[in-house]
Amino acid sequence: RLRSIGVSERVTASKLLWMHPRQMEKGSVSIGFVAEAMACIRLRGLDPEGVLRQAGIAPDLLNAPHARVSSRQFGVLWHAIAQAIDDEFFGMDRHPMKVGSFTLLCHAVIQSDTLERALLRALRFLRLVLDELSGELVCEGEVAHIVLHDRRMDTDRPQALSAQPRRAFAHGTFMVILHGLACWLVGLRIPVMGASFCDDAPPYADEWR
């Protein structure tokens, strides 16, 4: 029976601290994460204001570094972006996580008799869906470690894959998907005991603590 989760990272270029519930302003998300999520919209030349307004987020907030949005607004934004680009992973992997993938992931794990088996199935599923990011589950008693692997940083990969550094937001999104899924399965907020990453902290690092 797993009671907590630790996070570590291998073969990557970013350092990330996992999101913890904030003592202040619970249920809110930094505008920095909104800007990160919107990067795929800008890169594709789509209408950012239209996507933001679907989530009830004023476009001017992107120019206010201390602004925050509600967790619900960020969830609606995630859905709107996924619908706009047909990718539930914000276009951050070479292979898109097409709309409907997360629903199928939930169906794939819902009948698991233990959380450990559910996480193993989830990691196998994500390995099939994504090309560059994958995870490994290491259990030590009641503590589970999720080890993140990023193929973009492998030395034997084509140079084109490593030409652009991986955004820490990609690593965080991968872990948030897994952690949110695990909490949903057991109906509890599973505590994150710690995180270890191999490079400097990204912008808005305090927001992940």
Residue spans of the language-model regions?
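Alpha-helical bundle regulatory/interaction domains
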Residues: 115-209
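N-terminal low-complexity or simple alpha-helical regulatory segments
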Residues: 3, 7-151, 203-204
